[in-house]
Curated annotation (Swiss-Prot):
The lineage of its organism: Bacteria, Pseudomonadati, Chlorobiota, Chlorobiia, Chlorobiales. Keywords: 4Fe-4S, Cytoplasm, Iron, Iron-sulfur, Metal-binding, S-adenosyl-L-methionine, Transferase. InterPro entries: Elp3/MiaA/NifB-like_rSAM, Methylthiotransferase, Methylthiotransferase_CS, Methylthiotransferase_N, Methylthiotransferase_N_sf, NA-bd_OB-fold, Ribosomal_uS12_MeSTrfase_RimO, rSAM. It is found in: Cytoplasm. Coiled coil: none annotated. Residues 128-357 form the Radical SAM core domain. Belongs to the methylthiotransferase family. RimO subfamily. It catalyses: L-aspartate(89)-[ribosomal protein uS12]-hydrogen + (sulfur carrier)-SH + AH2 + 2 S-adenosyl-L-methionine = 3-methylsulfanyl-L-aspartate(89)-[ribosomal protein uS12]-hydrogen + (sulfur carrier)-H + 5'-deoxyadenosine + L-methionine + A + S-adenosyl-L-homocysteine + 2 H(+). GO terms for cellular component: cytosol. This is Ribosomal protein uS12 methylthiotransferase RimO. GO terms for molecular function: 4 iron, 4 sulfur cluster binding; aspartic acid methylthiotransferase activity; metal ion binding; protein methylthiotransferase activity. It is an enzyme of class 2 (transferase). Residues 360-427 form the TRAM domain. HAMAP family: MTTase_RimO.
Amino acid sequence: MHNIFLLSLGCSKNTVDSERLMAQAAASGMIFTEFADDADIILINTCGFIQDAKEESIAETLAAIRKKQDEKVRKVYVMGCLPELYRKELADEMPEIDGFFGTRELPDVLRAIGAEYREELLDRRILLTPPHYAFLKIAEGCNRQCSFCSIPKIRGRYVSQPPEQLLREAALLRQSGVRELNLIAQDISVYGCDLDGSSLLNDLVLRLSDMEFERIRLLYAYPLNFPMEVIDTMRERENVCNYLDMPLQHISDRILRSMNRGIDSTGTVRLIESIRQRNPDIRLRTTMIAGYPGETGEEFEELLQFVAETRFDRLGCFPYSHEEHSPAYRLEDDVIPEKKQDRVAELMELQETISQEKNREFEGNEIVVLVDQVEENMVFGRTEYDAPEVDNECILETGNFDVRPGMFCRARITDSTPYDLEGEVIGIG
């Protein structure tokens, strides 16, 4: 039996991988500690998607090596995306590490730390999120060939998890107290196509909706061949959030072709119009990339105009990262870093104005909020239109109400900022 400190870096997909590992290891008697200094093994689940993530993973690994050198821990293992890309290089540069494991080597990781992999525990997880919400990873890998992305190299081909397995996993999460279920994958749009020849996403959402989760949220949809019946389900099912996260990346036809996105500007605009016509209450989140190779000032202005006209409810923007394992690495990274950052800032300044205007529409209204955190007489939570960690936060005064994390409360919104709603609790449930 060992005391293990697990550091899980990167995206929610990595979080689920770490949660599965913890459940397997705990079944073998392993104990997970809150702090590295209380452990004899450090295990780091790394991210290798973009340069910033790689640098964070390297920094945390070096910090763990120092603890081993100082004899504060006995062993250090590194797993996940970074070893999937750079196992040999990492092993050469960091001989102090006791083992490197890729993204599909869970049994090997468990064996290294003295635990046993058990097939019957495949659906079990120990949550790293607060106990009232969880992520359900419905597929692994990606078949898209977006030129800027190294995920197919890291995670492999797209493999949908069988519906019955997902329903078993979801049932266990519901029994444990999860009230909000967030469906994730690299691409949820094509869920089930490798199993049935067509998307099974809507069928899965309907079956999960019948399981009495209070909220079901869809994240990371791909715009090409998105199953539109899901939008109808959002409108018709009270516990399916009127919310869709659909990264679009750009609107310039030339850049979309170079990115190999499979959709042009006309198709993108028509898709958004169709989604909003079928469900006027839906809130759309998207992600853009600024500074893609060859992006001209005119193409960036086209992106700005598109965002201004479309008025997304939530939007993130990232500077293009020139990744050596992506197809776009053969292109010249010719937009200088300063210009990339300037373009990100300009786009986010525009979105801030849009977000402020949209948030003002909530002022004076009563809404339902899922409570994430309580500090003294203040509540921090989210509406159905806000995903964990990335979207708006509701900041509420509790008044005389006994509000606790995981509860739903009714709130009256009295003020707003671009990324927060402020108000007071007026009821529970």
